[in-house]
Amino acid sequence: MQEVKCLTLKDLLGVRTLVNKTGSDDAASMNDHKENICMDRRKMTPLKSESLTAALNGHGKISSPEITHITPIKLTEKAHPDPWTPTANLKMLINAASPDIRDREMKKTLFKPIENKGKIAEEEEEEELDDSCQYEALDESERRPSRKQKSLGLLCQKFLALYPDYPESSESINISLDEVATCLGVERRRIYDIVNVLESLMLVSRKAKNMYVWHGRSRLPQTLQGLLQAGRDQHYDLLMDQREGNGLHAVQHVQNAHAASSRRKDKSLRIMSQKFVMLFLVSKTQTVTLDMAAKILIEEGQEESYDSKYKTKVRRLYDIANVLTSLNLIKKIHMREEKTRKPVFKWIGPGNFQSSSNSDDLRGQISNSGTERREKMARHSSFQVITAPPVNQRLISSAPSTPHRYSTDEPVDYSRKSGNNSAVCRLQFGDGVHPSVSPAVPSALASLAMPLQADLMPVPASFSHPLAILPQTPLLMLYSGNISDGASSLRKRERSEEDDHQTTKCRRRSASIESDTVESESLSSSTRRSPVCSPEGSPWDEASFGGLHEDDVAASSSKDALLSPHYLYVPNTAGLNSFNFLLPAGHAQGGVPAVAMPYFVVQSPLIAGAMPTSSTEGAAGFSVPTVLSPAQFVMAGGAYGVTEILQSPEHHGNVPATTSSPRAEESPKPAQTQTPVTPKEASLGSKSFFETPGAFGSLVNQSAARKRGSAQRRLDIGHTAAN
């Protein structure tokens, strides 16, 4: 039997001592037994695969049974910080093999120096190209332009920057689309869209294929005015109202317009641009949405729900809107009323095409007047334009305001005297002549406005010097055309005048009388002459005039018994002081009612200090005993005879006077000479305007009154001796 040997502690200690003894003598033997040394194992921590292979190799080399039974220390596996991947392994192998490969190639190139020069240069160029391509790819991704930078609006702005807005008329600027496309760095098809819109507004015109002529904005106002008229002819305004919900009555016109548009074969971008601009011009709000414009511009042959046609139309309209925005004709706004995000465009281009057509002259005027603006405030041109009087009269007559006259700077001369026996006071009020008829009375009445004018009346030779010059102050007369009513009212006036010995109730109405309303109601800016005759030669002598006496009223009542009642509106005039006005208040049936007299007014300055002369309801007399004696006002359709002198013992006492008739002196023209008629014949014509109880010297007949216009009637102030 084979004996089994057992290891004892002595054997183990012998191995340690053996190692210590041989370690100093032989280094190779130390390397063979280093795996059994614990300190060496702690210092070296191989991987699992390495430890296994080392253990296997160690056991193969060491055949000693003592080493074979030594159990190795199991180390904990540590995860690799960067786990290997196939790509990482490939990179590691390439890096490991690259030095050897480079060394091998470098050795080959050492023996071929001439061929090596060309190859090295080519390799360097290829490396540079590869690097530049990589950098360009990175820059391209970083510097990629946005959609706004590539938009048609920005491209149009660059295109417009190449040419002036207002070129010289003698200068011809040609546009080559190929050159422009190359200059802007875009395709030519992008330039086509811009040029088509510009051609629709006549900013450019086609000369040849891909050749255009630049005109600028000089023709833009005329083009827009023509498009506005064309849009109205095609009833685009009714279409816009219908889309806004206001054009239900225009359905028939809209159908006709659609039928006309459906027959139109030209569907180019230029025509569509013109239609799009027409919608802005005819719109009341001058705002258009692309949705509305697309539905209007779609022909009747296709349904609006046809998506492809509708979307195409909207896309093309959006391109047109971008170009128009670059031209500063429209702008995109946001409507708060609209809940959708669809764009809304508003017209900001020229609106007054006639005034903007002379843009060159306007710019010249602005540049010339710019230096004088600080020195002198410029007045608007409308202040220097004199409008037509009929227009002013129509506007003023509709104004519900109380009239008052303007203050005049002209001097008033009352000191002139005439040497003739029949002295005449000529009241010259102005030079304007604008006769017309004032409306606003009932049908039974005739309201005549008498412009007091001096231009149409001949000036007698004996009256070369006017005695008074007053501002434009017309008189307004209302009279009734009913003869019987006039006679009845005169009878009432007779009865009221018989009680003239009592104190007259004086009405004082102070009102601010506006000059514009006076002109509209009485046709202002006209003048009138009124002679006042005095046998003593001094028409303004207080002794030559008398007050309105009740006896004279009774004496003259028989002459004007059939005359119709009259009403006088007398404004505040400084030259009419101390004149008596009889204003009848009682009326017969069918006469002038009180409400029909808006100017039944005597202003307070005229009647200041007046004393009441009667308290009857039939008449009210106003008298101012200041400078002049009261005289009689007689107003008729033609020349006037001189009335008798009214003596007023209340104010100045009785003054004898003679009867005079200046009719021949007043009318140098034979055609206008008036023959005296009876008061009865004059009342039949109903053309007299105003009479007081004084006697009539003469009145005008009907045929002569027709010859004389309302602008030629005169106001005569006269007096004669009492019968």
UniProtKB/Swiss-Prot annotation:
Residues 356-370, 395-405 have a biased composition (Polar residues). GO terms for cellular component: RNA polymerase II transcription regulator complex. Residues 494-503 have a biased composition (Basic and acidic residues). The keyword Nucleus applies. Residues 147-216, 264-349 bind DNA. It holds the Pfam family E2F_TDP. It is found in: Nucleus. It comes from the Eukaryota. GO terms for biological process: chorionic trophoblast cell differentiation; DNA damage response, signal transduction by p53 class mediator; hepatocyte differentiation; lymphangiogenesis; motor neuron axon guidance; negative regulation of cytokinesis; negative regulation of DNA-templated transcription; negative regulation of G1/S transition of mitotic cell cycle. GO terms for molecular function: DNA binding; DNA-binding transcription factor activity; DNA-binding transcription factor activity, RNA polymerase II-specific; DNA-binding transcription repressor activity; RNA polymerase II cis-regulatory region sequence-specific DNA binding. Residues 520-535 have a biased composition (Low complexity). Keywords: Activator, Cell cycle, DNA-binding, Nucleus, Repressor, Transcription, Transcription regulation. Disruption phenotype: Embryos lacking both e2f7 and e2f8 contain multiple intersegmental arteries that completely fail to migrate from the dorsal aorta. Gross morphology of these embryos and initial formation of main axial vessels are unaltered. Residues 121-146, 356-379, 395-417, 489-546, 650-689, 702-723 are annotated as: Disordered. Residues 122-139 have a biased composition (Acidic residues). SUPFAM superfamilies: Winged helix' DNA-binding domain. The keyword Transcription regulation applies. Homodimer and heterodimer: mainly forms homodimers and, to a lesser extent, heterodimers with e2f8. Belongs to the E2F/DP family. In contrast to classical members of the E2F transcription factor, atypical members contain 2 DNA-binding domains and regulate transcription in a DP-independent manner. Both DNA-binding domains are required for DNA-binding and are proposed to form an intramolecular structure that is similar to the winged helix structure of the E2F-DP heterodimer. This is Transcription factor E2F7. The lineage of its organism: Eukaryota, Metazoa, Chordata, Craniata, Vertebrata. The gene is e2f7.
